[in-house]
Curated annotation (Swiss-Prot):
Binds 1 [4Fe-4S] cluster per subunit. Catalyzes the isomerization between 2-isopropylmalate and 3-isopropylmalate, via the formation of 2-isopropylmaleate. Keywords: 4Fe-4S, Amino-acid biosynthesis, Branched-chain amino acid biosynthesis, Iron, Iron-sulfur, Leucine biosynthesis, Lyase, Metal-binding. This is 3-isopropylmalate dehydratase large subunit. GO terms for biological process: L-leucine biosynthetic process. SUPFAM superfamilies: Aconitase iron-sulfur domain (SSF53732). GO terms for molecular function: 3-isopropylmalate dehydratase activity; 4 iron, 4 sulfur cluster binding; metal ion binding. Pathway: Amino-acid biosynthesis; L-leucine biosynthesis; L-leucine from 3-methyl-2-oxobutanoate: step 2/4. Belongs to the aconitase/IPM isomerase family. LeuC type 2 subfamily.
Length: 421
């Protein structure tokens, strides 16, 4: 029986020869992930089970990234709970401040997430790891606690939607962020509800791994159970530099069944900006012309990778941030930060008048390191622009890729990069 890549991964981890959409299964996990917001809740639930130890200390990852460094007593207590549990349990994949990064940038970089894995995380953007050819999805803290205790999780097999991006003739500065914003704009924030979004085509093959990670990161913004990109030579080259354990590559059968198939030519996709207050409000950047902004954020689990830093620096080199704009740049991990320093990118940001932060999720969730006041407007490379997402309920958040964000920081309004180059 023909199956999609998602169905094949779940079938094997459930010990089954085949599965069909709608079927309930129990699957073996390769990784259970939590952060400093969700982890303490999972730990409390775990301790209620009466279980002494996690099922496998090499398959649990605890990442204190949302409030790093701690912003107040409450966040310090959350980090302390994670730290003490990691030490007590001997958790291998725990990163302390100074080594930690934004979880969905850090784990692929460190070779913790690999093709063919089944991964659950108490964070909705766990779907990022689908870019490696893994089944990865967000769960609640209670399900995560059960996963830490048993090494298993239950799933309903999702239907799959196939997205084919034809051609490689990208418009200037268009990236994976623009492809995924365009996609969400076409199908809506519930257009893939509890479905697997499978991204294929020449356009996807042409993307870097950083661009692919960005795309899968935002699958959940269309309501998807997971996003996934079948591995190719580019994937394997990336993984083989990092992997410390065996992995298995899966691909969809040619005659696998999809509930919907979308097909677009990348040449027809311009730079995108998602207007408030939903990611589905994606429009060409030209429609944002004249919209003034108070703050720009370049970073996050969506666009905090090295390629994003490089793109932003290309535009900011020799430029100055507009006098009415605050520009905050946040490399996703310490390694990305270090590489950006070695390439001279950090100097470019600072010379332009940007704040460069240690890796943190901070402003994305309205936590700290860039909160918006009443009436303020931000352009951000993050993944959500809900009401009050980055601060005051009467603030506004627009979403874009790093090229548009950097250009807009210079002009003081939403702008195409060509306006400053």
């Amino acid at each position: 029986m023909a199956m999609t890549i998602t169905e094949k991964i779940l079938a094997e981890h459930a010990g089954l020869d085949k599965v069909v959409p709608g079927q309930l299964i129990t699957a073996q996990l390769d990784l259970a992930l939590a952060n400093d917001i969700t982890g303490p809740v999972s730990i409390r639930e775990f301790e209620k089970f009466g279980v002494e130890t996690v099922w496998d200390k090499t398959k649990v990852a605890l990442v204190p990234d949302h409030f790093t460094p701690n912003k107040d007593i409450a966040s310090a207590e959350l980090s302390k709970a994670l730290r003490e549990f990691a030490k007590k349990q001997g958790i291998v994949h725990y990163w302390e401040q100074g080594r930690v990064g934004v979880e969905h940038c850090l784990l692929p970089e460190q070779g913790v997430t690999l093709p063919g894995d089944v991964i659950i995380g108490a964070d909705s953007h766990t779907c990022t790891y689908g870019a490696l050819g893994a089944f990865a999805t967000g769960v609640g803290s209670t399900d995560l606690a059960a996963g830490m205790a048993t090494g298993e999780a239950w799933f309903r097999i999702p239907e799959s939607i196939k997205f084919i991006f034809k051609g490689t003739n990208f418009q200037p500065w268009v990236s994976g962020k623009d492809l995924i914003l365009y996609t969400i704009g076409k199908i809506g924030v519930d257009g893939a509800r509890y479905r697997s979004m499978e991204f294929t085509g020449e356009g996807i093959a042409a993307l870097s791994m950083d661009g692919r990670l960005t795309m899968c990161n935002m699958a959940v913004e269309a309501g998807a159970k997971n996003g996934i990109i079948p591995p190719d030579e580019k994937t394997l080259a990336y993984v083989n530099e990092r992997a410390k354990r065996p992995y298995k590559v899966y691909h969809s059968d040619p005659d696998a069944q999809y509930v919907e198939v979308y097909e677009w030519d990348v040449a027809d996709i311009p730079l995108q900006v998602a207007f408030p207050h939903l990611p589905e409000n994606a429009k060409p950047v030209s429609e944002g012309k004249g919209i003034k902004i108070d703050q720009v954020v370049i970073g996050s689990c969506t666009n905090g990778r090295l390629e994003d830093m490089q793109v932003a620096a290309q535009i900011l080199k020799g430029q100055k941030v507009h006098g009415d704009v605050r520009l905050i740049v946040i490399p996703g991990t310490q390694d990305i930060y270090k590489q950006a320093m070695q390439e001279g990118l950090i100097d470019i940001f600072i010379d332009a008048g940007a704040v460069v932060s240690t890796p943190t999720c901070g402003p994305c969730l309205g936590g700290y390191m860039g909160i918006l006041a009443k009436g303020e407007r931000a352009l951000s490379t993050t993944n959500r622009n809900f009401v009050g997402r980055m601060g005051h309920p009467e603030s506004e958040v627009y979403l874009s890729g790093p090229a548009v964000a950097a250009a807009s920081a210079v002009t003081g309004e939403i702008s195409h990069p060509e306006e400053v180059l």
